[in-house]
Amino acid sequence: MGRRAWIRPDVCFVAFASLMGMACLVLTPPFQVADEPNHFFRIVQIAQGGIVGERRGAESGGEIPVALVSMAGHFIDGNMASGEVRWERSRWANVRPYLQQRADLTATRFQDFRAMTRYAPVAYLPQLVGIWFAEALNLPPLWLVYIGRFCALVFFI
């Protein structure tokens, strides 16, 4: 490519979006973005065939594998609803099992993610592809998060 080809806006966008997107994908700790745990739970629910959220009393959500709820809890320190969340680096010391050991995704429990049940499944299509891919390869649970993020980035670009 000549020098002028790199100056085109579409090429600059793809290059910059790829670079910055990968930086955000890798450098942002799991579940530290607003509502990420709840969006993740909604994606998992849809990936398992739960198109419509369940209503149980005042809560709305769905059946989510206990291993994934436990993983999200490992990374959340504080109150997500109020925004009082702190990320402690010491949590990375115990992250290895979530990256290396496969989890039993058959045991489930009801998880409340009420604000996300309103979103249509089509909004989560890029992440769904990532979750299905990771589940098909029987990857450890944290890979579901990162592959879902990667598919959303690719779809955006």
Features from the language model and the residues they span:
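Aromatic-acidic/polar surface patches that form glycan- and anion
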Residues: 8, 32, 36, 111-119, ...
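Start-transfer (signal-anchor) and selected internal transmembrane alpha helices
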Residues: 1-22
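Selective detector of the "anchor" transmembrane alpha-helix that sits immediately C-terminal
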Residues: 143-157
